[in-house]
Amino acid sequence: MVDFRFEVKARDASGRIGKLTVNGKTVETPAIMPVINPKQLIVTPKELKEMGFGMIITNSYIIYKTPELREKALEVGIHKLLDYDGIIEVDSGSFQLMRYGGVEVTNREIVEFQHEIGVDIGTFLDIPTPPDAPREKAEEDLRITLERAKEAEEIKEIAMNAAVQGSTYPDLRTYAARELSRMNFEIHPIGAVVPLMESYRYRDLVDVVIASKVGLRPDRPVHLFGAGHPMIFALAVAMGIDLFDSASYALYAKDDRYMTPEGTKRLEELEYFPCSCPVCSRYTPQELREMPKEERTRLLAIHNLWVIREELNRVKQAIKEGELWRLVDERARSHPKLYAAYKRLLEYREYLEKNEPVTKASAFFKVSEEALRWPIVERARERAERVRSKFPETISHPIFGEIPKYLSLSYPFAQSEGEEDFTVEKPEKGEARKYVMAVAEYQFGEGAGEAFKDAFVELSRKTGMPRQIKAKGKHLATFRAEDGLLTLGIEGAKRLHEVLPFPRMRVVVDEDAEPFARRGKNVFAKFVVDADLNIRPYDEVLVVNRNDELLATGQTLLNGEELKIFQQGLAVKVRRGVEK
């Protein structure tokens, strides 16, 4: 049985921080796998592990075709061969197939060889079709790839990649993704994209990635094959990429090229290093230029690795803070083609919206005109318009325009910064209930405000803002200080359950989870049997059984589609259970 787990821990935009475990070894995603050429080690795998790289990737075809490497790998295993105790993924020779037109191994042979040498994540011999290939070639290559996928599925004994191919034809990418999602694979790389990145065709890259993502199961990590330059990490993660790999850290170093988060510079152009990594802190550009070629290459490779690691950490911190779109916006300014790709990504509104959290740890900053097209903004406008039909009184907001007055305390309207200030006004006497009802309509959908029509709202003595919401002596909900949205109490959940028809805001769990949910224990994904497809990440939800009996209320990390598909990790962080 394959030892493989992937669960989501945090998210922003369509990006996610995940926990990936293979054969008892765990890495946090997004993660990058430095490419290791076993014939030429500029930085050793052991050094990479010490630098914090918990995964590496190497080429099983090179090992297979090199007698001394093959014999040793079969004798001691790939981990001892490379002196690396982290997760080792291997390619199959597909890159050589794309570059040189052929390989001397069959699909079955390379899959079996990968198992024999003890790799953690294997790859079958797919056919990478380059961009702009004739449609007929792309279709035929994909047909062969899917045939080989079926063969690999039958014989595999390890976790395995199933690469999505289809050249630059979005419909073929989506078709391939759906077909592979039906098979028993663990990770889905998006293949044959290196030529797009090498020619700065980032806009086309966005089309390829999104076409693939819409067809893939959301519970499997997605790997952007050959992507390893830090300037694209933020954009790629915002699209939903979990894994990267690249030999660029070494290839660029050999060519005296110096990576930065905004692009690449030639060593000869630099008078100062804009970096404080161990290499840049110790040496000047002039000192590196005067070094022997081999030593200079190694030090530049180490610098490039530090920049890669630093940018991935920056992306993850942005996810934690709800600032990923802001980082994407910033990085997009580093190259006109990247900026075009950013604008192209924002056109995929439906895909982006379903993955976008309903609330964030940080305020919305209008940092550009593109920020007004971020999914959190467009969703807020659409929901506000719905609320406006019931609460027509409006106020003018410098970013969002005319908004319902009774949403003015809530995210993102109150928690936003633009060129002009927006002053949040305290509720006037007797109006606090309208704020609660309007927010319920905004947060839970049409009709939800009825659950609070007789509510008494306690105001904070310090701020004058709504806080505790009660009715007939019972606690219904809390009006959260941080984002002006509602956290449900038991009585509030019961009322919402009554006014919202099934399946609205429901997460349905099986019989095994019912007693635990009632006791206020968290709900894990494997126990979810159904969910409202309109649920979005970080929504407050109603946990029910198959008979629609209310069991608990809590906050979900997943959207409705993910709740129905994920089998690992947390589904609902239960706040309160409903005892029988």
Swiss-Prot record:
Instruction: Give the HAMAP family listed for this entry.
Output: TgtA_arch
Which Gene Ontology cellular-component terms appear in the entry? Answer: cytoplasm
When the coding gene is removed by deletion, what phenotypic consequences does the entry describe?
Answer: Temperature sensitive growth at 85 but not 93 degrees Celsius.
One Gene Ontology biological process: tRNA wobble guanine modification
Lineage of the organism: Archaea, Methanobacteriati, Methanobacteriota, Thermococci, Thermococcales
Known EC number(s)? 2.4.2.48
Q: Which organism is it from?
A: Thermococcus kodakarensis (strain ATCC BAA-918 / JCM 12380 / KOD1) (Pyrococcus kodakaraensis (strain KOD1))
For the ligand (Zn(2+)), the binding residues are 275, 277, 280
The record's free-text note on cofactor binding: Binds 1 zinc ion per subunit.
Q: Where, by residue number, does substrate bind?
A: 126, 192
Molecular function via GO: pentosyltransferase activity; RNA binding; zinc ion binding
Tell me which residues this entry annotates as catalytic: 91
Q: In which pathway does it act?
A: tRNA modification; archaeosine-tRNA biosynthesis
Protein task: Exchanges the guanine residue with 7-cyano-7-deazaguanine (preQ0) at position 15 in the dihydrouridine loop (D-loop) of archaeal tRNAs.
Domain PUA: residue ranges: 504-579
Q: Per its UniProt record, what PANTHER family does this chain match? A: QUEUINE TRNA-RIBOSYLTRANSFERASE
Asked if the record carries the keyword tRNA processing, the reply is yes
Name the UniProt record assigns to this protein: tRNA-guanine(15) transglycosylase
Query: What are the required cofactors?
Result: Zn(2+)
Per UniProt, the keywords (alphabetical) are: Glycosyltransferase, Metal-binding, Transferase, tRNA processing, Zinc
Q: What protein family is recorded?
A: Belongs to the archaeosine tRNA-ribosyltransferase family.
Q: Which reaction does it catalyse?
A: guanosine(15) in tRNA + 7-cyano-7-deazaguanine = 7-cyano-7-carbaguanosine(15) in tRNA + guanine
